[in-house]
Amino acid sequence: MPKGYIIVRVDVKDPEAYARYAAATADAVKKFGARPLVRGGKHEALEGTARARNVVMEFDSFEQARAYYYSPEYQAARQHRIGAADGEFVLVEGA
């Protein structure tokens, strides 16, 4: 079964609120078995506009990644991110 990935590209506007968001996601990350493959670090925009922070989370399946995003645990944590960062979240299925 192909793995699922959530790809996040954000520009953080409020580091304190974003830190609360990141800490609040811990329960959902553990519950859904998410594995962070990328969390920040060196990056280069090859095409398009770069974002300051890039994250890639791996899940056992597309469905598990989707369940993580829509879970009550993640949705509660997400409230800390609203207004703290601008960006995109994309759910993709691996090859």
Stretches with model-predicted labels:
Residues 62-90:
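C-terminal structural segments of small proteins and small subunits
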Residues 1-53, 58-70, 93-95:
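Short S/T/G/P-rich N-terminal loop/turn motif that feeds into the first structured element of a domain
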